[in-house]
Amino acid sequence: MRPARAFIDLQALRHNYQLARESSGGKALAVVKADAYGHGAVRVAQALEAQADGFAVACIEEALELRAAGIRAPVLLLEGFFEADELALIVEHDLWTVVHATWQLEAIEQARLGKPITVWLKLDTGMHRVGLHPHEYQAGYQRLLATGKVARIVLMSHFSRADELNSGCSDEQLAVFETFRKGLAAETSLKNSPAVLGWPQIPSDWSRPGIMLYGATPFDQVHPLADRLQPVMTLESKIISVRELPVGEPVGYGATFVCDRPLRIGVVAMGYADGYPRHAPTGTPVQIDGQPSRLLGRVSMDMLCVDLTEVPQAGLGSRVELWGKQVLASEVAQRAETIPYEIFCNLRRVPRIYSED
């Protein structure tokens, strides 16, 4: 069997959720959209269900997967419903839905629902992605109340630059939110992972931790609370070939790396088809049998090369950590000029192995 594996530490996951909940000062929906950022939504939700206040997913398909697996905790649809017909499924499966557009308000007004639903009413405070316009927000709230079809409303927005700790944008968005929700008697939800970790002064009854659950920092700088996160996924494979190369020999496609001295090269069964970033450059860190080393040359579809020169004991079958407890996913992502969110979500073709250790 091909040796590529992703080991998922469920105890670390629970630790990170508890840190999110304690740091936010309120309730927390564990965000498990995109297959729990590549970690496996069903297994993640099962591991957290006894602890979590609920879950958040992108769409109804993801919610129904959780319900089919027996998850009974609240599940919020972060993008809401895409068609009015989905309201029947929302009622049937006891889901919560975001409402971010006036057509969704109209759909609820016109629908015949078997019981009242929970709505998270989204305000566009400056990200300009989805959400009611500020001047529509109060009216939208009143329209929902007037339907008699809504059991509860939570007021929400989303920060666009909370990962930039020196930016004033989050304070500006908070000011917009407070202005246009004034007088509305409802719980609020503002905090995503960077807001939970970096903006403790922002009030929020509900938080929505995502990337922090999986042990990756949302920041590009050291942060004391983020440093308490524990990596959940360890991506590993093994060396399947060893080469001794003299000075001047190229490594991999395009000869982007040429040996500047005699080098011992290991070929690892891992490539961009598995989700390892193709644009990770020479020098991206790896661990080989617990010893630090580096990536060499261009990442191929199914293989990549590492430097064994300073790890003389390594050879065929040696364990290689691509990211995890020793090699942080955030560092790999930074080297590849992307973010840990993307490299986690890109994981595929790699079996996941779950443990409680």
Swiss-Prot record:
Identify the species of origin. Pseudomonas syringae pv. syringae (strain B728a)
Please spell out the taxonomic lineage of the organism that makes this protein: Bacteria, Pseudomonadati, Pseudomonadota, Gammaproteobacteria, Pseudomonadales
Do you know which HAMAP family this protein is assigned to? Ala_racemase
Chain positions found as N6-(pyridoxal phosphate)lysine: K33
Enumerate the UniProt keywords alphabetically: Isomerase, Pyridoxal phosphate
Chain sites annotated for binding substrate: R129, M301
Point out the gene that encodes the protein.
Answer: alr
Protein's name according to its UniProt entry: Alanine racemase
Q: What does this protein do?
A: Catalyzes the interconversion of L-alanine and D-alanine. May also act on other amino acids.
UniProt record similarity statement: Belongs to the alanine racemase family.
Question: For this protein, what is the EC number?
Answer: 5.1.1.1
